Amino acid sequence: MRATLDNPKFTNVATADEYLADEVFGINVEVNGAHRFYSYQILNWHQVVNDNFDGKNLTVTYCVFCRSFAVFETNKKFDLDGRVYNNNVLIKDRENNSSWLQIRGLSVIGNNVGEKLNQYQAESITWSDFKKLYPEGEVLSTDTGFVRDYTRHPYASYDTIKTVYFPLTNFNDVFDKKDLVHGVDLGDVQIAFSEYIMRNVPVETVDYKGHKIVGFLDEVGVIRIFKNITLGETELDSKYLPKNVPLDEVLDFTYDPKKDLMIDNQTGSKWNRKGEVIEGPLLQKKLKQLESVETFWFCYSAMFENAVIADINAIEFNKQ
């Protein structure tokens, strides 16, 4: 069984750069403006890190089979359960041995069945991007107390081959098994944004069953999903409102590749990758970012059998 890390040690960017590969991804966690990087090079071997970051008790988790990460703000301490469901690892809390699905933070076995953990916002980026964006950040150290070769993947080329190790209850073959998607759970519906699609269309606005959301793909390949708003909800002064556009029309966006910005087509305001207006009539407006999961498609389609997929035009949804 993979060994959990408790009270992990951290190092600086310069030291970590000696052993981390530029192209390898990891989890970027921000607390009060400070950043920590938990590299998959290390998480491949451990998968659960119980940490305290500037007073916040966080459990950082990674499923090596689904390539899914999740960070939870919780006082519970977790270990790997040793079992999987649809290839997603179960984690077990030490307090009462309840088992939880890693990708959903949902208790499925034990005294806490049905309870959900509080997900803490985080993102997956490459080491190359992290060290450029956050040169003062802290980095999970290889000084873990365990003897591991952190320069290699314990499952070799698993991330790039088509093989899936364990049975699936469902698979939707609209994408290849190991295509990456970002999914958001809206209660009555789950919506998946495909990295494959968004590399060509970096912004997708959707209005489905009353849910208004928009996905942005930023310059370092991170997909962020936000709750969208209507023109009326912008509270824009009437003198700036476009003519003949109904107030209940949802904002739609166009990507400007030269400036790496999103421009809403109703007001011409310019939005950055964090969902913030930096120029235009809606200056200082900010969209609310929604919790989402990043994982291989085979895992998401098995976990959320009725999930719908934002298509390339972000107008319709396909379920095949």
Language-model region placement:
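Mid-to-C-terminal functional-domain signal that highlights helix-capping/loop sites
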Residues: 1-320
